Amino acid sequence: MYKECFKIALGIEYNGSNYHGWQYQKFASSVQEKVELALSIIANHPVRVTCAGRTDAGVHSTGQVVHFCTSSIRNDQAWILGTNRYLPKDISVIWKRDVPMHFHARYSALSRRYRYILYNNSCRSSIFYQGLKFYHRILNVEKMNQAAQYLLGEHDFTTFRSSHCQSKTPFRKILYVNVFCINCLIIIDIVANSFLYHMVRNIVGCLIEIGISKKKVTWIRDILKFKNRTSSTKIVESNGLYLVQVQYSSLFKLPICPVGPFFV
């Protein structure tokens, strides 16, 4: 007997510290694996999800979006609370929406927003060590923000691209970038149509060099033009990086959630 198939979108929050990234791994634990296992129990059939952005090992999210198809009819409480019951404590479904069949978590996205959070203090934090990048030297936030503005617009971001990046084009368009501080936290807030592999973490590494006055503010503009990864600096750790928002057309009527993480 034929059963009608529905498409559902979910908002997913997770602490990526214990996972080898979002994407399913044959010999390592992934966020995708845990989400699919939990949803399959609720749906009573195997579920495969597609995400908006495949985060790396150790990267967190407060705004991941996924979609999946199902013929099972469940209420919102079952899809959210029921799924969470079978998820580990460091992964949560935070919202659910029915979406049209042409919706695609990745290809329907208009932009992605990441935040990298530095804990700029003389002593590290034992409470938030998994979710913050500790940096003990004093950083000049104003210089970092000035430098970041050179990245606005569409550019060839080869300089900030991993050598393992599989994207067919190095061109990306940064729509917004801001570096600001809240007490001991320095937040690098960046929005783009999409990102290259390791792009945000490589950018942050360069901004730190400028923040400690090792490099001039205009250095980031110059190395962007070089289009050479070796002209940049070393990549920063993944533990300070968060996928915080994915933007879609208002026609899909997805919820507008506060930009995380909650302690910012």
Swiss-Prot record:
Belongs to the tRNA pseudouridine synthase TruA family. GO terms for molecular function: RNA binding; tRNA pseudouridine(38-40) synthase activity. Its EC number is 5.4.99.12. One of its GO terms (biological process) is tRNA pseudouridine synthesis. The active site is at residue 56. It comes from the Bacteria. The keyword Acyltransferase does not apply. This is tRNA pseudouridine synthase A. Formation of pseudouridine at positions 38, 39 and 40 in the anticodon stem and loop of transfer RNAs. Substrate binds at residue 114.
